[in-house]
């Protein structure tokens, strides 16, 4: 994977998590502390480094809140900060990085750095304001400790690139979820929770169910309230629970029963406990259509790669968000 592609994917992933964290505090501008929180949640080795130091998302959030209160007190402002709310990033607009935070992302691909989350974390450890050093002090460690652990990391491996088989396109990725494996398994195996992680499912009819198949419906609006336009034959979805093996495996199959123009989509989840939560490996396969549509689809490999990555990214981010 090129440095540019790795940086683009890392930047997208960290930006989403950071701005979600900022939205909990009613902010529209993500700063260094939100970038740090995003790194704690990262599925890349940088996140593992922080979590192995005992830095969970709950502890990191408390440290950020304490630091904000200390900063206000140093200015002579004696006030109680409002409690953070739920994540509302997807329902609102107007988010951006503060310049010093975006500069960290840019510098992570320069001077021999590879654009990974580990590179971002390394740059963040040397930011000059002292904010991150103070957060780490509250969390019982130092920038030097973090850098020492980063120095021991193996080079990052490629991931998320789709493989084209005879009848499908298959993509895979991993995500970190800050919750116990049993809780994550229950979430993924529950048909009522499918709309919380599947972008193509807005609701599920749980009535008259045989227990392994349900009818779902595509979303009619986006989280921000804007309507979604979709042809009638693509409204309904058939959801099949293909496999459940507690507590480490769940597989779903989605089809469109009212049209032959859309192939089946199978999404498999493999769960494993890890420090601070659960690692979820996600594999999605898109069934290929036959005939002239299949021939026309052959040149669209870059588009297929992007579709695979963005779909896997959305699913992984949604699962993590459900437990934050």
Predicted regions: what is each one?
Residues 1-178, 183:
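Histone-fold recognition with a strong bias for associated Lys/Arg-rich disordered tails
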Residues 48-49, 195-201:
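A short gly/proline-enriched turn/hairpin at secondary-structure junctions
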Residues 178-197:
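Amphipathic alpha-helical segments
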Residues 181, 209, 243-247, 271-279:
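A short, structured loop/turn motif at beta-sheet edges
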Residues 192, 196, 204-205, 265:
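A structural signal for the main folded, soluble domain(s) of proteins
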Residues 205-261, 318-321:
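Glycine-rich portal/gate segments that line the openings of hydrophobic small-molecule binding cavities
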Residues 253-306:
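Beta-strand/loop substructures that line and gate deep hydrophobic ligand-binding cavities in soluble
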Residues 296-324:
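A conserved amphipathic terminal alpha-helix motif
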